[in-house]
Amino acid sequence: MKSFYITDAGRVRSHNEDSVTIVKNQTGEHLMIVADGMGGHRAGEVASSMVVTHLGSRFANLSTIGTKFDAVNWLNENINTINTNILKYTEENPESTGMGTTVVLALLTKDFLIFGNIGDSSGFVFKNGKLHKITKDHTLVNLLVEAGELAPEEAANHPKKNVRMKALGTETKQVLDVFDVDKNVDAIMLCSDGLT
């Protein structure tokens, strides 16, 4: 498998609070992660870095992730450890109040491919010449679209399109939305909401 990542602050922001990693464990299973930090005093960078550092180092030390069920449990257990660490950091560093991060990840083994997300960073697969979105954004506008209260074509220009309904560092317990995907794909793409 070929893998790479690109990160760029873009034209709007002076600095980038995204963190990204691609790691292999001891049996060659792959974990890909993008985390988009938020919060003042560069706290977003701290939060997003906590995600990729914690998950990446623990995954790299595994001999195997095991079954799909084992993988989901491992991911949620580690996501909640990270979430607790972010909340603790905020408590100990009041200047970082409001700190948090989104996370989107893909886990590829010889037997399965799963995606997981919290927030509005997205996961896609490229298959048969088309890009397919896998994850669902945790935003107010997306909830309104799913509830039938807002037309999809109105979502892009809605004044509250950037209101996140879920992120690490905002609640005491978090659960990844997990998506089981056919592993026979041409490419996997993860991105923060800033990709245009």
PLM region spans:
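PP2C/PPM-type serine/threonine phosphatase catalytic domain
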Residues: 1-196
